[in-house]
């Protein structure tokens, strides 16, 4: 009897092994032209570009969570700002001679115009529907107090008038005028306090999660697109023919499959660094990451929400990094208006909100540990700021809110944990390691795999970032007449700058506003607000900001 039992057991094991081998073989035979790792706005945007450029290419998207747009792209996990430098003061640093540098602001604004054109084109194609579900006009304002800050904002306003991209901006130091623009900010404020504000009517609030869901829903209508949820990438291996075999685990049933892809895009947010390292490409050795989270105070009280229609950004305190810039924002989430204030930085070793506490440790290697240490030593202000933020009490956060909303009541607000952002640290020959501003596309020399690292300015520039990726990875195709024609249909201003061309700027803003249902009035001539004589400033090194 024991022999029979043993025989049956051996047969069962053998049959199971044969079955597993058959499944493995079947999975190895699954092929796709493009594998998109991550179900966020970056993968959705790249997939949408490629659907128009090469409609016959097969695409597979894998997402670890049970739905798309549940991490950083989720509307509640970011500030929903259409970053265009209309109000973000850290994009216009003050030079040592006191002058204002606008180069970064112009670049950020140019990038957002590409996003607007991309979204407008998708609305016209029927890919994106009901623009008000994902983008709404919300004026963008800068607000400061104190003589030095007022002088800075006045000079910033004057400097930005050199650009055609900022012609609609208005400036005021009048309490009554600013109260009309942002009642919550001014009511209860000391009437003798010296304040100033700028306001641009064409600012936007954007629900990047909704854009992501709609783009992916459109991709799913094609038979050569596959979406696999609850699917986690466990391994990436380059094949001899420069294709990639990617092992994907089904988190629901515990099985694994192999996907053979000609091109792999790692758009997994905070998880992108670890997957890039897993690929083994030499370019990955130059990078490390440092996670920073964010919290917001949220109010859904109609008395608060209906009294505020603007995104109001302030100025970082002296000695604080740009990421500390507070803002009080109108948001449109889940079909209703709310007001958010923050962000307050938090620290966790997770690279994703739904990540692992081991993320930071597991991404630390012999290649990047020294650059990380150098960055910590060279950016002590940042370290000090993060420590101070982690130590904030409920009362501390409320006092910070009252600087922007003097009559705020505690009972109207609750604390919300937003998403995680991973700041790029790159090895540097001179400094050992440096914090990299913005986002960075990292690819292999063969152009078979690419990853997006970084956090700022984030989702608002998904369209230009993915356009940059196309140029970097598919350079020969991008230069072809076919791709050139298609790209110019998607982004009418592709290949040229709007800055300095008033007619082109107004034409594109008018077009995108009409299609997206946004407010746009032709700008009037700028006022003659005098530029102050600013004091010379000490040279300040750049510090990475967080796009929350």
Curated annotation (Swiss-Prot):
Enzyme Commission code(s) on record: 1.1.5.4
Pathway the protein takes part in: Carbohydrate metabolism; tricarboxylic acid cycle; oxaloacetate from (S)-malate (quinone route): step 1/1
Biased composition (Low complexity): 530-541
Pfam family membership, one: Mqo
Keyword Transcription regulation assigned: no
Cofactor: FAD
Catalyzed reactions: (S)-malate + a quinone = a quinol + oxaloacetate
Chain spans, region Disordered: 521-548
InterPro entries in the record: FAD/NAD-bd_sf, MQO
GO molecular function, one term: L-malate dehydrogenase (quinone) activity
GO biological process: tricarboxylic acid cycle
Domain of life: Bacteria
Keywords recorded for this protein, A-Z: FAD, Flavoprotein, Oxidoreductase, Tricarboxylic acid cycle
Keyword Oxidoreductase: yes
Family that this chain belongs to: Belongs to the MQO family.
Protein name: Probable malate:quinone oxidoreductase
Encoding gene per record: mqo
């Amino acid at each position: 009897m024991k022999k029979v039992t043993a025989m049956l057991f051996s047969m069962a094991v053998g049959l199971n092994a044969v079955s597993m081998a058959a499944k493995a073989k079947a999975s190895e035979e699954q092929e796709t032209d493009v594998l998109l790792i991550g179900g966020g706005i970056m993968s959705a945007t790249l997939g949408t570009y490629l659907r128009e450029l090469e409609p016959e290419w097969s695409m597979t998207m894998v997402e670890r969570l049970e739905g798309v747009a549940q991490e950083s792209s989720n509307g509640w996990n970011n500030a929903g700002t259409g970053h265009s430098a209309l109000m973000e003061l850290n994009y216009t640093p003050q030079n040592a001679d006191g002058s204002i540098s606008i180069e970064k602001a112009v670049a950020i604004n140019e990038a957002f115009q590409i996003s607007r054109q991309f979204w407008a084109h998708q609305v016209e194609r029927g890919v994106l529907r009901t623009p008000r579900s994902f983008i709404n006009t919300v004026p963008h304002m800068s607000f400061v107090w104190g003589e030095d800050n007022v002088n800075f904002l006045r000079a910033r306003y004057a400097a930005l008038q050199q650009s055609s991209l900022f012609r609609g901006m208005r400036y005021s130091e009048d309490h009554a005028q600013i109260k009309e623009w942002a009642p919550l900010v001014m009511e209860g404020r000391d009437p003798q306090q010296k304040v100033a504000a700028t306001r641009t009517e064409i600012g936007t609030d954007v629900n990047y999660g909704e854009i992501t869901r709609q783009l992916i829903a459109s991709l799913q209508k094609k038979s050569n697109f596959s979406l696999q949820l609850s699917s986690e990438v466990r391994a990436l291996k380059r094949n001899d023919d420069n294709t990639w075999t990617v092992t994907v685990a089904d988190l629901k049933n515990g099985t694994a499959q192999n996907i053979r892809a000609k091109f792999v895009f790692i758009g997994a947010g905070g998880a992108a660094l670890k997957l890039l390292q897993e690929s083994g490409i030499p370019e990955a050795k130059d990078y490390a990451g440092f996670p920073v989270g964010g919290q917001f105070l949220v109010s859904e009280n109609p008395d608060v929400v209906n009294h505020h229609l603007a995104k109001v950004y302030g100025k970082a305190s002296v000695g604080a990094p740009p990421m500390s810039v507070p803002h009080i924002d109108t948001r449109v989430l889940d079909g209703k208006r709310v007001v958010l204030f923050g962000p307050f930085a938090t620290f966790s070793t997770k690279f994703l909100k739904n990540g692992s506490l081991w993320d930071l440790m597991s991404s630390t290697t012999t290649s990047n540990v020294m650059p990380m240490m150098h960055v910590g030593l060279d950016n002590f202000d940042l370290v000090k700021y993060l420590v101070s933020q982690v130590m904030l009490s409920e009362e501390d956060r409320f006092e910070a809110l009252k600087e922007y909303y003097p009559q705020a009541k505690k009972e109207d607000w609750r604390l919300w944990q937003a998403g995680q952002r991973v700041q790029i640290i790159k090895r540097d020959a001179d400094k050992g390691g440096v914090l990299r501003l913005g986002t960075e596309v990292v690819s292999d020399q063969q152009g078979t795999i690419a990853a997006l690292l970084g956090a700022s300015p984030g989702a608002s520039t998904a369209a230009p970032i993915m356009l940059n990726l196309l140029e970097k990875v598919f350079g020969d195709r991008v230069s072809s007449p076919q791709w050139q024609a298609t790209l110019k249909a998607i982004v009418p201003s592709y290949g040229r700058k709007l800055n300095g061309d008033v007619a082109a700027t107004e034409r594109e803003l008018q077009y995108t506003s009409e299609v997206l249902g946004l407010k746009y009035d032709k700008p009037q001539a700028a006022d003659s607000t005098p530029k102050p004589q600013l004091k010379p400033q000490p040279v300040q090194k750049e510090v990475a900001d967080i796009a929350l």
